[in-house]
Structures are given as structure tokens and as C-alpha cells.
Amino acid sequence: MFTSPGPVLFQFGPLTLRWYGLLIAMAVLIGLNLSSRLAQSRKLENGLISDLLPLLVLFSVIGARLYYVAFEWHNYANQPIKALAIWEGGIAIHGALIAGTLTLILFCRWRSQPFLDVLDVLAPSVALGQAIGRWGNFFNSEAFGVPTDLAWKLFIPYANRPVIYADAEFFHPTFLYESIWNLLLFVLLLVLFRWGSRERQNFPAGTLSCVYLIGYSLGRIWIEGLRIDPLCVGALPPACEGGVRIAQLMSAMLMVLGGLGLWWLKRRQQQLPVSTNR
């Protein structure tokens, strides 16, 4: 059984350190170190990742928040200023992926860097960062699943339970499911990166990113079906009956995009003369 100690790590006067913030900082630092090492193995520009990461994190967080607020506008319409209170929770990974990708495209054009190579270098760190960041949901007692009595159940305080589940105490720890899934995906991506670095002729740039899209989306579609707080169109959470879960729809689209990307990369690679293969 899991029980959250609360969202605040410590508080000293006006200074408050939250677990979520600490986890995000950890994910960024680990991602910086890992991506920098992978960038060296791909012979990318020195200092590229350290220059890119602050911009990528900033705009990804902004995109994640805007995406969430857009689909939850009914909760912010009367108090738009609350949309800025990101420390209260409410970000969406798909918004971060969209904003982060746009930022990366512009950055690579500015620095004349190979977009697909940089994207592949970042993919393992993104998966690992998600595995770490999901534990923020645990400390905030949010993004949990339907009630359950399994041995690994998660206790949710009364104040954090939806009204229709007010009498339930234990729920699926969907944060844990997604954290484990992303950790396994990270290991897979790292293995593929090492293998692809030796077999560039059979592993064109962009392959790793497509594998990430497919792998993450498969897990998210399953896990999202368990959650009781989905972003929803056509119905209201927690049931979302008769509506569409936005994360499942986006994940399905990204999975198709990843599959088409692999097909296109393979086809393009086959059309290249052998002497120009990388």
C-alpha cells in the first residue's frame, strides 16, 4: 500500500520546497547529463544540449500548462489568473511534447543542427524524465486511477477524492504504472541507441524518436483508461462516459505518427546510395 507524505518537502518561512519541483529539477539535471553524453557519441556540436535544455524545459512547461488549461477552461473562466498557478498542479505531457518539438525545430534551424539526430539524443532522457516526474503525482495525491483493493493500492485523502468516490479510500496508483512503463521504455531506447550507433546504415536518424512515440503511446492508452481525472471532450470526468479521453486520442495519433515515421525512414534509407548511408 502507498500513502503520500504530502506535496511539501519542507517549508522555512515564505520558502516552500515541493516534491514535484524537486523531482522536475532532478529529471532536468539527469537529462542534461545523459543527453550530453549521447550527443558526444553522435558527434553533435559541443555544448549543444546545455544551450538547448533551458529553452526546451521552459517552453515545454508553458506548453504543458496551456494545453491543460485549454481543456479545463471551465475551471479557470471565472478566475483566469489561476491559470498561472502551475504549482497547484495541472500540466499535460502531450502539451509539453508539442511545445518541446516546436522549440527544438526552431533551435535546430537556428544552430544549423540535424533535427532528427538531436531528437534521438533527447528521446531516452524524455522517457527517464517522465518516469521520475510521475512520482510528483504521488506526492500531490493526483492523477490516480479507479478504486481498487490490490496489494499495491494507493491511499488518497478524503479532500483529494472525487465526490462520486468519496467513500473509497484506495485507488490504482497509475503514477506507478506509468513510471515503470517509462523506465522500461528508457532502457529499451538506451539499448537501441547503443545498437544504432554501431549500425547506422540500418538505423537512420529519427528511428529512436519514432520508437518512443509508439512505446509511450501504447502505455498511455492503457493507463489513461484507468484514470478518473482525464481531460475529456463530450463528457465530464471522472466517468467521461460517452466522451473522448483526450490523452488516449492524442496517444493513438502519435502512435500512428510513429509507425508512419518508421516506414518513411526505412523507405528513404533504402533509396539512398550505399556510399551515402550514415
Swiss-Prot record:
It is found in: Cell inner membrane. It is an enzyme of class 2 (transferase). Keywords: Cell inner membrane, Cell membrane, Membrane, Transferase, Transmembrane, Transmembrane helix. Its main location: membrane. It holds the Pfam family LGT. The keyword Membrane applies. It comes from the Bacteria. GO terms for cellular component: plasma membrane. The chain crosses the membrane at residues 12-32, 44-64, 86-106, 113-133, 173-193, 203-223, 246-266. One of its GO terms (biological process) is lipoprotein biosynthetic process. GO terms for molecular function: phosphatidylglycerol-prolipoprotein diacylglyceryl transferase activity. Pathway: Protein modification; lipoprotein biosynthesis (diacylglyceryl transfer). Its EC number is 2.5.1.145. It is a multi-pass membrane protein. The keyword Isomerase does not apply. A 1,2-diacyl-sn-glycero-3-phospho-(1'-sn-glycerol) binds at R134. Catalyzes the transfer of the diacylglyceryl group from phosphatidylglycerol to the sulfhydryl group of the N-terminal cysteine of a prolipoprotein, the first step in the formation of mature lipoproteins. Belongs to the Lgt family. This is Phosphatidylglycerol--prolipoprotein diacylglyceryl transferase. The gene is lgt.
